[in-house]
């Protein structure tokens, strides 16, 4: 906790570091709710604008990432003119525009004080993450978290989020960065780090969010292969032990058995993924999104308008068992979300923006081998895995996690 108090004291005493102080509490805003997440981005955007116009700091204009983001945001602004409900799309597009200020204020702060940023800021993030981490373990053991919150959904964990079952998203959003922090500053404790990684895998599994567990398992496996190759034999034994433990847990708990065996078995019993999707609610979402895309192939129906369009009877498809449950705020898959809401125009630009950003970041990582950048690359890449369910790209909580990891990923790119 001394690290946390030292961070607060050092940052508050220096007026120029107000933005650093605000950034240092980033994970906390996700625990407090969407209002605080939005305020976080807005305040940092205003600080960024102040620096641009009052201090005439415009170095970011030479950064290719800036123009990539501008290109992406400009495509969203164009989309508003073709949106079926422009007033519904506008706030989400403006929120994405505000993210620009956050990214480059974040990058400027990290570049100017990289050692302080990594040790103090990421250290504080890691402390907050660990508090949530242990709270999740507490709930797994006792059935309620330290505040008495319980999950209304069997086999899922609530933690500090109470009735918002997003513990898995939060875990995924900050887990790789926290792991990077421990590897950078506590590398001498190799056995403890290996044990921590294995416990993280176990906790991610027990949170009960299948999609986030799949993403985390893929991500941590890649992380180990890249940065922990010398310990691969230990990890292999650990993974095998976890597999046996997972099997025991699944078959001793009806909730986990239902989520990880019964529901997954349906994919194989259906003979194909296509048949499985016709039986599932996700399939109904995906099919409706695809039909929306076919009706509006160039510009889609507009950002955040999937919900307004799919309620129409024309999107009912009786080949999909749960077609009457197709309505949702988003299609639960980022590719279908962009295709249905921004059409080919927006989808192609989105892919260009994301893939170019990942390419530039990977190119830099290969040269400098920074674990924090690797953590950002992994999260952003995992966010665009096809078919695996995901949160809405334009909703506050998942978007916040995405842009924070995106900022980490691109902030290490050297000119």
Regions found by a protein language model. Give the residues of each.
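Alpha-helical transmembrane segments of multi-pass inner-membrane proteins
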Residues: 22-27, 118-152, 161-230, 249-252, ...
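Transmembrane alpha-helices of multi-pass inner-membrane enzymes
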Residues: 43-49, 220-221, 350-353, 376-388, ...
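Transmembrane-embedded, aromatic-rich helix segments that form part
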Residues: 38-43, 101-102, 169-173, 198, ...
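Long extracytoplasmic/lumenal interhelical loops at the membrane interface
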Residues: 273-287, 291-295, 299-342
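Transmembrane signal-anchor hairpin modules in multi-pass inner-membrane enzymes, especially those
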Residues: 1-91, 108-123, 181-191, 233-235, ...
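Loop-to-helix entry and N-terminal half of a specific, functionally important transmembrane alpha helix
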Residues: 15-26, 67-68, 72, 329-333, ...
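A membrane-periplasm/extracellular boundary helix in multi-pass inner-membrane enzymes
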Residues: 134, 227-274, 285-295, 303, ...
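Hydrophobic transmembrane alpha-helices and their immediate junctions
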Residues: 49, 126, 189, 221-225, ...
